[in-house]
């Protein structure tokens, strides 16, 4: 099956997202094409990855690069959201500097969203900006986090509060590696795919309702879904690279979702990012319904689809206790969309009719959270 290419055209930078099977075996050619350097074989590549991906795919990638006389330095961190931290960032930076990689060398993010965010942030800072390539290995990273240049780490005050916009030279999305992804991780990525339909693509959401189960099997339908997702995000990012306007729509479900991730201390046994987005999207639509913006039937339809693929949709689906409404509200107040202490949410007026709601009254949000917590206690 031939690889597909989606191009992101920005004001000062243009790069390709290459999507298809068995791309690890073609990595040297793709990297060389993207970096466009005459002394390519003298370059050194730092491969930042995690323990899970390293055990499954690192040998294959290193063998491909070594075969093409490319020097590699693997940097392996612990798998999981807790690696998006200052301490792990320092380890990655220290190892790249210790290897004496130069600005013209390259950092490869070989993993899921955590690795992409972490490695990209490191690349943005080292020598004021190194070459950077994304090689996402999860569905979530292939359709969302590797596309658009957001990098960063978490803080005890909240998720993704420390970071930078730093675009890669290219994104190489090998769809074959998704066959080794645990079902829970694949479902988590699917939540972000559903999000694109709910933002402003009702036809895509309806297509997912018909074809969603096929995406969980490798084949042409899966690749089509990934390509369509990347095309949608590429269009949004091209119009609003630095999230000053419509790119904020991509945060549908994320205000509530990030709140829940922080409240559960980024504990993957309780919640992972895509799951938090699934619950967050339902909460966003329920809050919209409370404001008389959407009909309850739409919420039921979305929830039915998410449940059909095994995603959590309610607070009661999260193991363990949650903080009280006031504590959750304090976490929302740290959301990166907050401006001049005013709350901003992505809400909905119907299927594929999401919008940016500014100056949302805090008392309405607090009352809504209290109601949701009462339902599970």
Curated annotation (Swiss-Prot):
Pfam families, A to Z: DHQ_synthase, DHQS_C
Highest taxon of source: Bacteria
Binding site residues for NAD(+): 113-117, 137-138, 150, 159
UniProt: Zn(2+) binding residues: 192, 254, 273
GO biological process: amino acid biosynthetic process; aromatic amino acid family biosynthetic process; chorismate biosynthetic process
UniProt keyword Cytoplasm present: yes
Name of the top EC class for this enzyme: lyase
Necessary cofactors: Co(2+); Zn(2+); NAD(+)
Free-text remark on how the cofactor is bound: Binds 1 divalent metal cation per subunit. Can use either Co(2+) or Zn(2+).
EC number assigned by the record: 4.2.3.4
Record keywords, A-Z: Amino-acid biosynthesis, Aromatic amino acid biosynthesis, Cobalt, Cytoplasm, Lyase, Metal-binding, NAD, Nucleotide-binding, Zinc
Location within or outside the cell: Cytoplasm
Main function: Catalyzes the conversion of 3-deoxy-D-arabino-heptulosonate 7-phosphate (DAHP) to dehydroquinate (DHQ).
Family the entry assigns: Belongs to the sugar phosphate cyclases superfamily. Dehydroquinate synthase family.
The protein's name in its UniProt record: 3-dehydroquinate synthase
Gene expressing this chain: aroB
